Amino acid sequence: MKKNARRWIVDILIMIAAAAVYSLGVHFFISPNNIAPGGVTGISIILAKFFGWGVGTYILLLNIPLIIIGFFLLNRTTMIKTMITVVLITVFTDLAEMFVPVYDASNGNGVVAAIFGGAAMGVGLGLGYNRESTSGGTDILTKIIGRKHPDLKLGFIQAVLDGVVRSEERRVGKECRS
């Protein structure tokens, strides 16, 4: 019993660190420089720009139905940890919007913002994955599809799902500009 409780404490501490790093990458580098990553985070950034609520709020709202579906189709422990991580990402992202300045890449350093933002998000995701958690969103869909089609690599599934989101982000962006 003690070992299990200790493991959960370590897992939660690492999930806190993972969510903080991920959120800072989104807030500090990605969102202010109009870089829309794939998945729920990318959709959330676009919604925040259009409707004005915090990016973290949209991350939570879009993840609620996915988490519910995940509870029916995936490992319960993974989904509990994912739910905790999504709430942490929501809180940290919205707090960062209030208190943390952003990296302005308007001087031509958009590539730097994309690299550092992507790296921070990747480190956060990796830390979470290492503890049987996800950031929610398309990660949940990837795990569900991967379970139904074990012959497909999870990275491939994730790339396809994020590619679909990115293509829709571009289409919506073009329609909004015209």
Question: Can you say where each PLM-predicted feature lies in the sequence?
Answer:
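Membrane interface segments of multi-pass transport proteins and intramembrane proteases
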Residues: K2-N4, F51-G56, D94-G108, G146-G155
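C-terminal ends of transmembrane helices
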Residues: I14, A18-A19, P65-T77, K143
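Membrane-interface helix termini and inter-helical loops of multi-pass transporters
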Residues: N34-S44, E97-N107, D139
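Short amphipathic alpha-helical coupling elements at transmembrane boundaries
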Residues: G42-K49, D139-P150
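Hydrophobic, membrane-inserted alpha-helices
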Residues: S44, L62-I69, V160-E169
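Structural signature of hydrophobic alpha-helical transmembrane segments
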Residues: L47-L61, G110-I115
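Mid-bilayer segments of alpha-helical transmembrane spans in multi-pass integral membrane proteins
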Residues: V87-L95, F99, G110-E132, K153-G155
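Conserved small/polar residues in nucleotide/adenosyl-binding loops
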Residues: R170-C176
